[in-house]
A protein has these predicted regions:
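A short, well-structured beta->alpha microelement
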Residues: 1-8
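A conserved amphipathic helix/loop scaffold
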Residues: 10, 18-200
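Conserved acidic residues
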Residues: 13
């Protein structure tokens, strides 16, 4: 976050914020200036900005993510279920569980999305409250999951929606690539098809 506050990060189409729970005034201003622009998409997880350095509140999260939320003091399982509906971000995921699906994952406070202007993508498994949603903002798109550990397929769908190159449609294949090499790891050792981009 210090690089963001200094304005020294490159411009990206997609930003993934892995639950920066404590965002001070300078860091909040930097997200507005350097990230929320040029049709970018930002993925937020759990409770981004719940603390501004002096207080903990739902309003702090709303100011950062653009979503209306509520804080629930009762512990909730960090397990969600994706909505069973047609949406480009849910391709191959409709009705699937996500998050921490084994063991005890209860956490408090739980964050619930209450924004009526957002499009719901997922729910808490144990309560049915909204846990994942997307919202078009002024010049950018906000994607928020209050349950972390989104599956790779979700990110693949997001990249597709933003017109980015996808090397493999196989959910069991990991591809690492740059302009010099392509490395492929298949969980099951089966034949797979790799789509090379214009760099090769």
């Amino acid at each position: 976050m210090s690089d963001l506050a200094k304005g020294v990060i490159p411009e990206y189409k997609i930003y993934i914020m892995l639950s920066p729970v404590d965002l001070d005034k300078e860091e909040r201003e930097a997200t507005e200036k350097y990230m929320k622009r040029d049709d970018s998409t930002i993925i937020w997880q759990y409770a981004p900005g719940i603390s501004d350095g002096s207080s903990l509140s739902a309003k702090n999260i709303e100011d950062v993510t653009g979503f209306r939320v509520s804080l629930q003091k009762d512990a909730r399982e960090f397990t969600g279920i994706f909505a069973d509906k047609k949406h480009e971000l849910l391709d191959g995921l409709r009705g699937d569980y996500y998050g921490i699906t084994t063991g005890n994952s209860a956490i408090s406070p739980a964050v619930v999305i209450t924004d009526k202007e957002a499009e719901t993508l997922g729910y808490y498994k144990d309560t049915g409250d909204v846990s994942c949603a997307v919202k078009k903002m002024d010049g950018w798109t906000s994607v928020y999951t209050t349950i972390p550990c989104l599956p790779a397929q979700f990110f693949r769908n997001l990249l597709k929606e933003n017109g980015k190159h996808i090397y493999s449609e196989d959910r069991n294949v990991v591809v690492l690539a740059n302009d010099r090499y392509v490395a492929v790891n298949s969980a099951y050792g089966a034949d797979t098809e790799i789509h090379l981009d214009s760099n090769y």
